Amino acid sequence: MEQVADFDTIYQAMIQISVVLCFALGIIAGGQR
């Protein structure tokens, strides 16, 4: 079982999602100004 590889993939996916969410929130905050 390659749990380490799966965890690494999930970890990278979470980082990408976090970056996208932060970018989206930045646009929303900028638009609300």
UniProtKB/Swiss-Prot annotation:
Bilayer topology term: Single-pass membrane protein
InterPro entries: Inovirus_G7P_2
Localization in the cell: Virion; Host membrane
Keywords: Host membrane, Membrane, Transmembrane, Transmembrane helix, Virion
Major subcellular site: virion
Taxonomy, superkingdom: Viruses
Pfam families (alphabetical): Inovirus_G7P_2
CC annotations in GO: host cell membrane; membrane; virion component
Membrane-traversing stretches: 10-30
Annotated function: May initiate with G9P the virion concomitant assembly-budding process, by interacting with the packaging signal of the viral genome. The assembly-budding takes place at the host inner membrane. In turn, G7P and G9P are present at the end of the filamentous virion that emerges first from the bacterial host.
Family of the protein in this entry: Belongs to the inovirus G7P protein family.
The name this protein goes by in its record: Tail virion protein G7P
Organism listed in the record: Enterobacteria phage M13
Protein encoded by which gene: VII
